[in-house]
Amino acid sequence: MDEAIQIVNAIKKGQISPIYFLYGEEAYFIDKISDYIAAKVLTEEEKGFNQMVLYGRDVTIEDIIGNAKRYPMMAERQVVIVKEAQHLSRTIENLCSYADNPQMSTVLVICYKYKKLDKRKKLHKIVKKNGVIFESKKLYENQVSDWLRKHLLSRGYSISHKAANLLVEYLGTDLSKISKELEKLKLALPQQTEITPEHIEEHIGISKDYNNF
């Protein structure tokens, strides 16, 4: 969680790496980092010729390397985002040759969800040396409640302990699912509101008396 914030903050400061390998069980942080790169690294004018999204089920590692080696057009950088890269798990180590000598004018983002990358293998070591490698781990229930409070606080809301527990009990630890439900609350309630079980029942439809036992 904190590491994801550090990665985004570094990008905000202009500290942009040539390769980001984002992997792990929690899709939420992978999406947040890749979406931030997609939104902020290039200007809207630059994106037309210099930003592309590839899907792991449709491409090979060689396709990815070929696109990453292109030069940007009328821009300092190009951005290549590979979504669903977990479909390339059998050949992912073939990325080593590129990761060892990445194109510095390319920002290559690999979104490798729901999979582990073996830390003992060459690719993990090379990306760690030349770029950013981030493991997005599932949060435990007690960590999700803490994340929920911080997430809302950063957006001008607070939440009662009972309401936070209600959301986690009902929705589990899937941060993407929780985030979507929080959007409903943010649309319905003004900032500075403390979210209560009654708000959750009214706007999300989870009974304030819900108990999964």
Indicate residue ranges for each PLM-predicted region.
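Conserved beta/loop motifs at nucleotide-recognition and modification sites
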Residues: M1-F213
